[in-house]
């Protein structure tokens, strides 16, 4: 089913009108797809403040080789706008854990598994746990600056206990600004912290519009910290894995990449020269070549 009502075509940034997949619990998942049905499937998982539109730099070029599928996770645009963030019969809680199961059921609903999965930032963490929890659905895995802390000896597994205090304080301030109506300032604080100072001010209009559309998810996300990566979980990843970071990515992402490179059997790491956290946008050509080449190489 195509989704047309309730969405201004200009909000799609030139992407095709999204389809809707209705899962077995009634949850409706908006997604866009490019390429052809007979092509191998590549599933893209967005991160914080984003939705399927984040993958525009990939959905066009990579459609020459793959059937590219990019869903918007529940609560993210346009799900909230159209009332799709809730299951039939009740509200759906925002959580990374629910998003993992949601993606698993989404792949099963499409009947296309196993698929090649690409996840960025928070979406990288969700994609990682998708591969751990549903190994039969993931053919290969690409993690780009995966979000989440790295477990240390003595940690109890809760990500909130291992994130540095300054990061938690900054995130609380960003949520406070957004909640008080100073959305632009809150987004600037958060986005610059996960990329580089000044990144928000230099961001394209489309990225800013997308972040504004998803600003309400930030406070929900901060109340649901990502789990810390550990060797035990990483050892359960059974598929070929490519891990990408940017030369200028913040340390918290590079730390996660370094740990996962050592823990995931056979994982390959590539650093994109000159790139920071938004590598698939700012260095789309290099990113696309890596992603396309990873599937061929595997």
Where are these predicted regions, by residue range?
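Residue in the alpha/beta-hydrolase core beta-strand immediately N-terminal to the catalytic nucleophile
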Residues: 72, 116, 139-142
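Conserved acidic catalytic loop of the alpha/beta-hydrolase fold
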Residues: 97-115
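Gly/Ala-rich beta-loop-alpha elbow adjacent to hydrolase catalytic centers
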Residues: 119, 123, 127
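Conserved loop-alpha-helix segment in the C-terminal half of the alpha/beta-hydrolase fold
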Residues: 60, 231-278
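Conserved alpha/beta-hydrolase catalytic His-Asp/Glu region
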Residues: 178-220
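Catalytic active-site module of serine/aspartate enzymes centered on a nucleophile-bearing elbow/loop
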Residues: 265-298
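Flexible "cap/lid" loop of the alpha/beta hydrolase fold
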Residues: 128, 132-133, 137-178
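Conserved HGGG/HGGXW glycine-rich cap/lid loop of the alpha/beta-hydrolase fold
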Residues: 23-89, 106
């Amino acid at each position: 089913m195509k989704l047309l009502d309730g969405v201004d075509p200009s909000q799609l940034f030139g992407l095709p009108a999204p389809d809707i997949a209705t899962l077995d619990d009634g949850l409706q998942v908006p997604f866009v797809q490019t390429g052809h049905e007979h092509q191998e499937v590549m599933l893209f998982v967005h991160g914080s403040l984003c939705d399927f539109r984040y993958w525009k730099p990939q959905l066009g070029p990579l459609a020459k080789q793959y059937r590219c599928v990019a869903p918007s996770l529940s609560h993210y645009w346009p799900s909230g706008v159209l009332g799709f963030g809730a299951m039939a019969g009740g509200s759906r809680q925002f959580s990374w854990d629910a998003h993992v199961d949601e993606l698993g059921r989404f792949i099963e609903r499409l009947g296309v598994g196993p698929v090649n999965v690409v996840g960025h930032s928070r979406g990288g963490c969700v994609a990682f746990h998708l591969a751990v929890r549903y190994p039969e659905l993931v053919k290969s895995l690409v993690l780009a600056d995966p979000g989440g802390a790295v477990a240390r000896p003595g940690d109890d597994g809760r990500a909130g206990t291992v994130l540095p205090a300054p990061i938690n304080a900054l995130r609380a301030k960003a949520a406070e600004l957004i909640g008080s109506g100073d959305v632009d300032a809150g987004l600037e604080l958060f986005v610059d912290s996960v990329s580089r100072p000044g990144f928000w001010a230099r961001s394209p209009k489309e990225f800013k519009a997308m972040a504004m559309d998803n600003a309400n998810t930030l406070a929900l996300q901060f109340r649901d910290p990502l789990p810390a990566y550990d060797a035990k979980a990483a050892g359960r990843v059974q598929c070929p894995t490519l891990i990408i970071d940017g030369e200028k990515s913040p340390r918290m992402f590079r730390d996660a990449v370094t740990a996962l490179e050592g823990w995931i059997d056979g994982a390959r790491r590539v650093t994109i020269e000159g790139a920071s956290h938004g590598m698939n946008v700012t260095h789309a050509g290099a990113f696309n070549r890596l992603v396309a080449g990873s599937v061929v190489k595997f």
